[in-house]
Curated annotation (Swiss-Prot):
Biased composition (Polar residues): 23-43, 173-182, 191-208
UniProt catalytic activity: Couples ATP hydrolysis with the unwinding of duplex DNA at the replication fork by translocating in the 5'-3' direction. This creates two antiparallel DNA single strands (ssDNA). The leading ssDNA polymer is the template for DNA polymerase III holoenzyme which synthesizes a continuous strand; ATP + H2O = ADP + phosphate + H(+)
Organism from which the protein derives: Trypanosoma brucei brucei (strain 927/4 GUTat10.1)
Transit peptide: 1-21
GO process terms (BP): chromosome organization; DNA recombination; DNA repair; telomere maintenance
Disruption phenotype: No growth phenotype.
Function (record text): DNA-dependent ATPase and 5'-3' DNA helicase required for the maintenance of mitochondrial (kinetoplast) genome stability.
Higher taxonomy: Eukaryota, Discoba, Euglenozoa, Kinetoplastea, Metakinetoplastina
Record text on subunit structure and interactions: Monomer.
Protein name from the UniProt record: ATP-dependent DNA helicase PIF7
An MF annotation (GO) of this entry: 5'-3' DNA helicase activity
Gene, per the UniProt record: PIF7
Pfam families linked to this entry: Herpes_Helicase, PIF1
Coarse class of the protein's main subcellular location: mitochondrion
Length: 992
């Protein structure tokens, strides 16, 4: 493709005149000193390539004559076919009201097309000219209602639609098809070379075809920032906050031809009607230990389609960015800059990133033990400087209680009622129980007729799993469940053994042997057709098999490939589950409910234009159970989760948040120790909270300045041209590597505070591990004095079967209950006060299981009355007093605290036992969430426990019984013993 300079206004006018007059477009006719374009290349293609690569300056882009009239400048440069609008005129035009713009559109439409409109429209509303369409910032696209009577827009010549891997090609030679999601996007920019409508009619049709979206106030604000102000953003928030809904609205409002929708997982890409990021970029799966940025760039440069994608792209959407490694992000930024020949961040591309760093981190397949770096740790992140937009409003009103619980699990700050609810949903399956009634029935009807083995709640395994999607942390557990369920069927089995040729071995993350039978549940392992809903992660049921000898296969290589996989020629026929659409813009789902023949799939490893290896297999695996990693991005109605195998940070949150209804959630072996958020992500979100004022000021400045700001913020980057030759050769002008950015931008500020918080988070992580390893089970303690705090009494109340647990700990084990004065005072206060004013935990702090009011459930929204729970705790205290098992603290029963023992002194800054902390960092407060009141309560409790140790240690042990990490750590630090009723010890171990 010819990439000669096309910079001046005169050149643009000349191109338009030549186009309208029918003269051939030669470079000599446009500019006497440049080389001729390739044969058959049109002015539209020239302008499109130049604008998408960042070569055409915004102030040189064309505008329609009517737009100039509205700008009010009679001195504007004009032409019979093309009128060039100056930057000042566009700024004036951007201030025109929505009513005025629409009024002029209707007026000109009623008057009919102007003479010679074909040549004028060709450049007036070109698909690559995003800034020069009718001012979308004033048309308020998200509120425009679809006009059912307006004719459909004609398919634009030269505009590539969604292709087979979800990307948008830049060449007419690419075989492109339109996805369902692509059809729903508003075609705001139309190339009119194949249209009989005037530019104004095209613009009006484009506006009326934008779907109507219902957005909240905070969603509208973010929508405006992305669509109208062209700012790169990072969209984040917890489950149920409307991230996907907002992304669909944004995608629908952006130009189809230059907006590329991607995700880090195939399923997430399906949900947005896009493609995987690896497929779009052309990078493939690369290893940072064996590949450099330059090597990847050269490979991408040799791929025509990927090269065209990067040059055509103006907006890049990336969902599930939490699974994007920092190295890969830096590599993408490097490739984008060099292919586009532009020093701007990502070569000037606007980024719309979405995800939650408190979900699963990136998977390091090559070095599993090596700590992965999250995306915000990338070197290029401060240059991109995305404006962080946090969604906090939840839209699942019926799931308000569950939403509150998920937010607490997300940040690892579980309150007493959340712990109680999770415990009530949990069953113990590490120990088998026998249903006595079913045992009698079994003796009567036969050994095989009745299942007598149950969990702790009397449910059999089949009752817990049938109809539920089983989520497990480890692949070995998933394989065992799938094998068992598969064996219950009696249909014929067809097996396929994977084949591999070329370098390396058959991929370890693919099943080497696939065995399926009619009636079994399966999951798709490849993105076969995103437009038809056939994405990696789609679940369905095998209904039958067809012979490839009789079946007309979609791929010519199917029969040959099948001969390498099996000694038969049968292909599975799968009916995939229906995926209900959630709103305009949803992609996929076309194949849901239909029978699909699954043919062998090829996974090819390429280096440049050469195939170095190829693996072939039927892209299916059994799906009765799936791994938690595989489930990220899914929405499941019935979920069974086992906490026993959870090992990864964020795994518990991802598993629980897959379920849409808490009533259909089964938890096996709940263990609060497994609720572990990533401390780097916690520090990042805490830093974001601390610079919230700066974020609000940045948003205000962005809106006040209109569209004058760059996608990466207010600072500017000196740009220069570079391009590749037609054969994908080297860049003509080397892109400077010493890249600069505003060192005081918001991303830099966030990173500075994150680094300042990290030592405290690391210290707390160490403290937490020590507490969990040294806390004893209260149900195993014998003949001791248990100093109870508020959380332990509430836990005793919330536990399933509190009466039996009370009997075990205090009657059978012979323990005595001792209650500090401050604990009883707090319980009485909570029982007699409506504490609705108390704010719930909304920030990612580390105050796990805190006993202060800020951690009590009054504001979490759970259905049961917390006052009743507190009253129940007081009732237990009265019963214990009547049983002579309880005694309360009396006046004078307190000793001063002993010094911190040697092994805990390194954690003294977090313990705050002897004096108020003074770190000298006034602008970076402690990450620990308990306040002064909590600290005073802990001190009073510990002083009472110290008194009991000095007085009764000869007659038995003294334990501090608590469910909070902070109090447990403070007690252990001064040499006291600690026990837990529920949450600081493994529940499963107590049932022995």
């Amino acid at each position: 493709m010819w990439d000669g300079p096309l910079r001046s206004r005169q050149n643009l006018r000349t191109v338009a005149k030549l186009r309208s007059s029918g003269c051939p477009l030669t470079q000599s006719a446009i500019h006497p000193t440049t080389t001729s374009p390739s044969e058959g290349e049109t002015a539209s293609e020239i302008l499109q390539g130049q604008a998408s690569a960042g070569y055409i300056e915004e102030q040189q882009l064309p505008a329609t004559s009517s737009q100039l009239e509205m700008s009010g400048d009679s001195n504007a440069a004009s032409d019979n076919n093309v009128v060039i609008m100056t930057k000042r005129q566009r700024d004036d035009l951007s201030q025109a009201s929505q009513a005025e713009v629409l009024s002029r559109l209707r007026t000109e439409d009623a008057q009919g097309p102007a003479e010679n409109n074909g040549a004028q429209s060709d450049l007036a509303l070109h698909s690559c000219d995003m800034e020069e369409r009718v001012d979308s910032s004033k048309l308020n696209l998200n509120h425009v209602t679809v006009n059912k009577h307006s004719p459909p827009a004609s398919k634009s010549a030269g505009i590539s639609q969604q292709n087979d891997d979800g990307g948008c090609g830049a060449s007419e030679n690419v075989d492109n098809t339109t996805t369902a999601a692509s059809k729903q996007r508003g075609k705001l920019l139309l190339d009119s070379s194949s249209s009989n409508c005037t530019p104004k009619q095209q613009a009006q049709q484009a506006v009326t075809q934008v779907p109507e979206w219902e957005l909240s106030h905070e969603q509208e604000r973010i929508f405006d920032i992305v669509v109208n102000h062209r700012r790169s953003v990072f969209l984040t928030g917890g489950a149920g906050t409307g991230k996907s809904h907002l992304l669909r609205a944004i995608i629908a409002a952006l130009p189809l031809s230059t907006t590329f929708v991607t995700a880090t997982t195939g399923l997430a890409a399906l949900n947005l009607g896009g493609t995987t990021l690896h497929s779009f970029s052309g990078c493939g799966f690369v290893d940072q230990h064996t590949s450099t940025h330059q090597m990847v760039y050269r490979n991408v440069l040799g791929r025509k389609k990927a090269r065209a994608n990067w040059r055509k792209c103006r907006v890049l959407v990336v969902d599930e960015v939490s699974m994007l490694d920092a190295w890969f992000f830096d590599m993408l930024e490097y490739v984008a800059r060099h292919i586009r020949g532009c020093r701007k961040p990502f070569g000037g591309i606007q980024l719309v990133l979405s995800g939650d760093f408190l979900q699963l981190p990136p998977v390091n397949k090559h070095s599993p033990k090596q700590e992965t770096r999250l995306c915000f740790e990338a070197k290029s992140w401060p240059r991109v400087n995305p404006l962080v937009c946090t969604l906090s409003h939840q839209f699942r009103q019926k799931d308000k209680e569950f939403f509150s619980l998920l937010n607490e699990v997300r940040v690892g700050a579980l309150t007493a009622p959340s712990l109680g609810l999770l415990s009530s949903l949990s069953v113990i399956t590490t120990v088998s129980f026998v249903d006595e009634e079913k045992l009698k029935l079994k003796r009567e009807v036969g050994a095989e007729a009745v299942d007598i083995i149950t969990d702790s709640k009397g449910r059999t395994r089949r009752q817990r799993q049938d109809g539920f999607t089983i989520l497990r942390a480890r692949r070995s557990e998933v394989d065992a469940i799938n094998t068992e369920k598969f064996g219950e069927l009696d249909t014929e089995i067809y097996s396929y053994k994977g084949a591999h040729r070329g370098e390396g071995h058959f991929p370890s993350d693919l099943p080497s042997t696939v065995s399926v039978r009619a009636g079994c549940r399966v999951m798709l392992l490849a993105n076969l057709d995103l437009s038809a809903g056939l994405a990696n992660g789609s679940i369905g049921t095998v209904e039958s098999f067809v012979s490839s000898k009789l079946h007309q296969t979609a791929n010519p290589s199917t029969k040959d490939d099948l001969q390498h996989l099996a000694d038969h020629m049968m292909l599975p026929v799968v009916r995939f589950d229906h995926k209900g659409k959630q709103g305009p813009g949803d992609g996929g789902g076309a194949a849901a409910g239909r029978l699909v023949v699954i043919e062998p799939h090829r996974w090819t490893m390429r280096q440049g234009d050469s195939d170095v290896s190829c693996s072939i297999q039927i892209p299916l695996q059994l799906a009765y159970a799936i791994t938690i990693h595989k489930s990220q991005g899914m929405s499941l109605s019935h979920v069974n989760v086992d906490f026993a195998g959870i090992f990864e940070e964020g795994q518990a949150y991802v598993a629980l948040s897959r379920c849409t209804d808490v009533a259909n959630l089964v938890i096996e072996n709940f263990d609060a120790q497994r609720v572990n958020p990533n401390i780097k992500a916690l520090a990042y979100y805490r830093a974001l909270e601390f610079v919230g004022t700066e974020h609000r000021e940045a948003e205000k400045k962005l809106i006040d300045n209109g569209n004058k700001m760059n996608p990466w913020g207010p600072y500017d980057v000196e740009d220069f041209e570079a391009s590749d030759d037609d054969n994908g050769g080297a860049v003509k002008k080397e892109v400077v590597e010493n890249l600069t950015y505003d060192a005081e931008n918001i991303s830099c500020m966030v990173e500075q505070f994150r680094q300042r918080y990290m030592p405290q988070y690391i210290m707390f992580s160490t403290l937490r591990r020590r507490v969990l390893s040294n806390t004893e089970d209260a149900a195993r303690v014998k003949g001791a004095l248990l100093v109870m705090d508020t959380t332990s009494l509430l836990a005793l109340t919330n536990m399933t079967g509190p009466t039996s647990l009370y009997q075990t700990i205090f009657t059978e084990r012979g323990n005595m209950m001792r209650v500090p004065r401050v604990v009883k005072e707090e319980l009485l206060f909570l029982a007699s006060t409506d504490v609705k004013e108390v704010s719930s935990v909304t920030t990612p702090t580390l105050h796990s299981f805190c006993s202060t009011c800020s951690s009590t459930p009054c504001s979490t929204g759970f259905s049961y009355d917390f006052v009743e729970v507190v009253s129940c705790a007081l009732s237990i205290m009265e019963n214990a007093k009547c049983d002579f098992l309880l005694d309360e603290q009396r006046e004078g029963e307190a000793n001063s605290l002993p010094p911190v023992i040697q092994e805990w002194r390194s954690l003294s800054p977090l313990l705050m036992l002897n004096s108020s902390p003074d770190t000298g960092e006034k602008d970076a407060p402690s990450v620990i969430g308990f306040g002064e009141r909590s600290r005073e309560q802990h001190h009073s409790t510990l002083m009472f426990a110290s008194f009991l140790v000095s007085r009764y240690s000869g007659n038995g042990a003294v334990y501090v019984c608590t469910e909070t990490v902070e109090l447990a750590a403070r007690a252990l630090a001064i040499g006291l013993r600690v026990c837990s009723i529920a949450y600081l010890c493994n529940r499963a171990r107590r049932v022995n």
